[in-house]
Regions:
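Nucleotide-activated sugar donor-binding and catalytic core shared by glycosyltransferases
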Residues: 1-96, 101-230
Length: 230
């Protein structure tokens, strides 16, 4: 077997499991290749709400929140912080493709449904969602994949969880753990909206999950045949 590890940490984990170093190659994650290919394609939003947002004039915050461990008090805190930010910054447009879980939808409507610059929309397919991320100023999420994808587009990510399975992102500075307390989430988002240096530090940090060339590196390894084929 060959092992194409997205990150150095992934490689080190494989080594600790006893896998031979000569069969492990750090390539980046192929999902970033796919993301950047989609992001480069021309696309016009079909969604009525998204088609009316002036992404050049507004600072768009993309939100996703769906994890079961956040249901209840934590989700109330998260949505409360997002609502507070939306009310304080009239140049911000919050876009939240709401998960289909009825409990998530109820909480979202209760906290955010009456705020004029918060848009609760239906879930998006991949291409429009990538375009939404690409046009965003900031991402607030409890999703795992977005912690890898949004930084590839130069977007800071606040993770509304107590922990993350993507520690490389935190170490690289592309992601910050905002936790699940309302005041902390609010303050961290506010900092990114008011402190250009803090924003740029995250936006320009190098994404540890790849640069869009993982597939090429994998192909190069296979072509070179620098491994035992048996």
């Amino acid at each position: 077997d060959l092992h194409f590890a997205p990150t150095i940490r992934n490689r080190d984990n494989l080594l600790r499991e006893g896998l031979p170093a000569e069969r492990i190659f750090v390539t980046g994650n192929t999902v970033i290749d796919a993301l950047l290919q989609v992001a480069d394609k021309p696309y016009e939003f079909q969604d009525e709400v998204l088609s009316k947002i002036d992404f050049a004039a507004k600072r768009v915050i993309t939100v996703t929140c769906h994890r079961r461990e956040n249901l209840g008090e934590y989700m109330d805190n998260i949505f409360g912080a997002i609502g507070q930010i939306a009310r304080e910054f009239p140049d911000v447009e919050v876009v939240y493709p709401v998960h289909l879980n009825p409990k998530v939808r109820e909480a979202a409507r209760r906290h955010l449904g009456k705020i004029s610059n918060v848009h609760l929309i239906q879930p998006l397919t991949y291409q429009p969602f990538v375009r939404l991320m690409a046009g965003s100023y900031l991402v607030i999420t409890d999703s795992g994949g977005m912690q890898e994808e949004a930084p590839a587009l130069g977007k800071p990510v606040l993770v509304v969880r107590r922990e993350t399975e993507r520690p490389e992102a935190v170490e690289a500075g592309t992601v910050k753990l905002a936790g699940v307390e309302r005041e902390t989430i609010y303050e961290m988002a506010r900092t990114l909206l008011t402190d250009p240096s803090a924003y740029q530090a995250m936006a320009k940090a190098v994404n540890p999950y790849g640069d869009g060339h993982a597939c090429r590196r994998i192909i190069d390894v296979l072509k070179r045949g620098e491994f035992d084929a048996e």
